[in-house]
Regions:
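Flexible, low-complexity junctional segments that flank or bridge functional domains
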Residues: 6-234, 248
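C-terminal "post-core" interaction segments
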Residues: 199-206, 213-233, 241-387
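N-terminal Sec signal peptide cleavage junction
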Residues: 1-3
């Protein structure tokens, strides 16, 4: 996840006469030397050896990719594409995630509401038997035997790309045809739930997909629902949540621990030694609708990253916290957005590390590896519903 707003452009900023490859590589050099969190550990490479600025950037940051600190977190994009993704999670696709179960069967692991897959009533756990790429159906085994690529199987990210799916559910087999279209990822999978238990207040359950702007009003309604039901125990399902906006993470932290940590640092942002003046400590604030849970269980996988890990790390000093699933991805850093003036280019660059209010961070190989969290190991059984 990146910052809630683009950072200042690097100084000095010069208007560019052109947006050619050479100027883009110079832009990368100017920004990375000033802002990159580990600027002193960059590879010594020659810009002239690279045909495009992205490959040059990846060559520069290669030493940080090897040890897992920056495995592709820094990249070039366009301002329009970046803003669309962070505001609504917009992309072009069929609207499903997939995985393989313990018998290596291909199954849908998540189906987005309002997507082509959702409109076709496909569901998590449905088994895909075969896919029609342009003509006859080919079984998953046949596609694997001929080493069909993901791009070939699912097609380009273009509106109108069509694929057929032969699907099995509870012994019944049916076929659907899906056409890709532009989608906005729903922040929640379904609605927040109240899980009843005899003689006790209910448990609140939320499956949270992404820290995007569209989530903000939904999180307020979630908090109101749980507060009105006297919820003190929460299950927050972040198994596929790869992060997003810090502003949304702040909102969620304030809902969970704004009252408990009032006046304390919620989390801290630490930059390189050239940019220590940018370091900030963000304090907890009490929102209009707050929860003060006693216990929280976070469902996590290696797909749980960035803002998701920040929230878990920051709330843990205030609430009894347990992780359920497997270790998280390990994205303890954030990017800023740098725009090349006069061009469409935007550089998303790792520029800061996130720490909780007690100064704890460094979860580059996952939260569990820090030794500060209890993990209840559990497999993500994609044959079953989320809850």
């Amino acid at each position: 996840g990146g910052s809630s707003t683009p950072s200042p452009n690097p100084t000095p900023v010069q208007e560019v006469a052109s947006c050619d490859v050479a100027s883009q590589k110079r832009f990368v050099d100017d920004v990375i030397d000033d802002w990159y969190l580990w600027y002193g550990e960059l590879a010594d490479v020659n810009a002239a050896d690279y045909d495009d600025p992205n490959s040059y950037l990846q060559a520069l940051t290669a030493p940080l990719a090897v040890d897992g600190r920056d495995p592709g977190f820094s990249y070039l994009t366009t301002a329009a594409a970046d803003e669309a993704a962070l505001s609504s999670g917009a992309y072009i696709g069929f609207g499903f995630r997939y995985g393989f179960d313990t018998s290596n069967a291909f199954r849908f692991s998540d189906v987005l509401e309002g997507s082509p897959a959702g409109d076709a009533d496909l569901r998590r756990g449905d088994k895909v038997l075969a896919i029609a790429i342009g003509g006859e159906f080919e079984t998953i085994a046949e596609l694997g035997a001929r080493d069909a690529t993901t791009l070939e199987v699912f097609g380009d990210s273009e509106v109108g790309v069509e694929r057929g799916f032969r699907v099995e559910r509870a012994g019944d087999v049916f076929e659907v045809t899906l056409l890709k279209r532009e989608l906005a990822t729903p922040p929640f999978a379904g609605q927040p739930l109240l899980l009843s238990r005899a003689g006790m207040d209910p448990i609140g359950y939320l499956h949270f997909r992404s820290f995007i702007t569209d989530a903000e009003p939904l999180l307020v309604e979630m908090a109101r629902t749980f507060r009105d039901a006297n919820v003190t125990d929460l299950i927050i399902d972040l198994r596929y949540n790869g992060g997003g906006l810090l502003s949304v993470a702040e909102q969620l932290l304030n809902i969970f621990a704004g009252e408990l940590g009032q006046g304390d640092d919620s989390y801290r942002i630490s930059h390189n030694d050239k940019r220590t003046s940018e370091n900030v400590a963000v304090s907890f604030e009490v929102p209009d609708v707050a929860l003060s849970p006693r216990r929280m269980a976070f469902i996590v996988t290696e797909g749980t990253a960035s803002a998701s890990e920040l929230v878990i790390n920051a709330v843990s000093p205030y609430v009894e916290t347990v992780l359920v699933g497997s270790d998280t991805f390990g994205k303890a850093v954030g990017q800023y957005a740098f725009d090349q003036r006069g061009c469409e280019n935007r550089l998303r660059l790792v520029a800061f590390e996130t720490l909780n209010g007690e100064g704890q961070g460094g979860y580059y190989t996952g939260l569990v590896d820090t030794g500060r969290f209890t993990l209840c190991p559990a497999a993500d059984d994609i044959t079953r519903e989320f809850h």
